[in-house]
Amino acid sequence: MTVMTDPMIAARGILKLLGQTVDEEDLTLAHESLDYGYPRTAVYCGVAAALQAEAPIAENFRQLIINEFAWPEAELKDVMDLLEHIPLKAA
C-alpha cells in the first residue's frame, strides 16, 4: 500500500475528477502510476488520457492541475502543452 502524501491525495482527487469525463479504462496508466507512488506522473497520464479522449477540462480545474504540484520546469511545460490542446469546458 502506498503512503498517502499531500501530492498523492491531490493526484487521487484530480484523477477522480478526470474520471467524470474520461473512461476509467483510459485512466488505467494514471492509476497505476499513482499506485506506484508517482503522483505527478499519474496526473500527467490522466491529462494525456483526457487529450486523447477529447474530454473538456474547465479553467479552474486546469489551474488546480498546474498549481497543486511543485512541477519541475520541463514537466510543467509538458503539462501546459497538453492542457493547451484540450477543449475548454464551459463553466
Residue ranges and their predicted role:
Residues 2-91:
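C-terminal-biased regions
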